[in-house]
Amino acid sequence: MKPRPGEIVAVVAGLDVSPGRLAAMRATFTAREAARFVSFAHEEHRNRWGAARGALREVLGAALGQAPADVEIRYGPHGKPYVDGLRFNLSHSGARALIALSVDCEVGADIELPRERRRTDDIARRFFTAGEIARLFASVDRKAEFFRLWCCKEAFLKATGEGLSRSTRSYEIEFTASGARLLWANGIPDAATRYSVFPLDPGDGYRAAVVAEGGGLKTRLVRWP
């Protein structure tokens, strides 16, 4: 499970777990995580959040050689979580979670379950760059392309650790024959060579992406458990 140097491990976990497994996951939570779990009013949202957090602790524990309950998760200045000895990022949508792992570079992950009712054209005009909009509107399957791009852009924000403090129109991503690439990012002169973008196919209709700080990287997709 632990990534090799120069490798990004992308772990896909199902979130509709049995009551027994969810109870075992909850037993690994900190007081802060337990409070967050019970704060959800909707049972499905509560259980899926708990399963995502539990899967994260299981995966981190497996990679670090620790029990899930012993993994100490800390938070950076922009709220990005981290642990000693491993870089990671978590995203979840619908009934799936995506966990990106690395031993030597910052990573960001995003997974999305495309929703038919979302007004994707309006969202694109608001949040994408002019170049991204032009390529999106020229694509054959505009809705599918929208979610592919959305995942890549979200993953970049999470890789930099800036989150919502950076505008989604302050950087541009382009799809290529072999995947995707970052063209530019305001405030990061070497952005195009500094970050690698990896669109992923997690299956079951989901879209996903991982962005990592570094070049010459490889990805490995893993199903959990």
Regions found by a protein language model. Name each.
Residues 1-225:
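Core catalytic alpha/beta fold that binds nucleotide/phospho-ligands
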